[in-house]
């Protein structure tokens, strides 16, 4: 390899590594452009853990501690069968329950016509509900006033 081709090789290799790094941080950079407002009970630990999960993914999070969340869920049109412990809003979408950050990022990038995403109930192993390596299966539901579609599925995982 002569000097010129070595230089090109080093530059190209460096650019390749830089692009890998940029790709790794791209979701975080994207998330930082959006503010997530979370309505939760002041005493709920799993809601606080989900907030930490979202912050770790790069979201700017504002928390509103509210004793009775039923009026919030009704205001944001979350059907009773989709409800969980906390409700969040971001960029015109509702996020109900322990939705993984990567699904919220996908929602914001794809911008489907919907009210939002929900993980009904409180499935073990969903973000904020971690218990060791165990994960119960759960689905992330994309919902509108008339439809519900499976947006993502997370299979069961044992320790």
Predicted regions: what is each one?
Residues 35-36, 59-60, 91-94:
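Short active-site oxyanion
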Residues 1-20:
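N-terminal secretory signal peptides and thylakoid transit peptides that target proteins
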Residues 61-72, 81-82, 90:
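Thiol-based oxidoreductase modules, predominantly thioredoxin-like and allied folds used
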Residues 75-159:
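Thiol/selenol-based redox catalytic cores and closely related redox-interacting motifs
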């Amino acid at each position: 390899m002569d000097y010129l081709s070595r230089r090109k090789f080093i530059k190209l290799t460096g650019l390749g590594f830089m692009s890998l790094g940029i790709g790794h941080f791209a979701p975080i950079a994207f998330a930082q452009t959006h503010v997530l407002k979370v309505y939760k009970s002041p005493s709920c630990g799993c809601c606080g853990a989900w907030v930490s999960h979202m912050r770790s993914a790069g979201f700017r999070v504002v928390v509103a501690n509210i004793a009775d969340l039923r009026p919030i869920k009704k205001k944001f049109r979350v059907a009773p069968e989709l409800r969980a412990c906390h409700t969040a809003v971001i960029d015109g979408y509702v996020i109900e329950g322990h939705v993984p950050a990567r699904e919220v990022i996908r929602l914001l990038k794809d911008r489907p016509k919907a009210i939002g995403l929900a993980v009904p109930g409180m499935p073990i192993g969903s973000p904020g509900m971690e218990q060791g390596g165990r994960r119960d299966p759960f689905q992330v539901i994309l919902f509108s006033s008339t439809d519900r579609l499976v947006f993502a599925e997370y299979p069961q995982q044992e320790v």
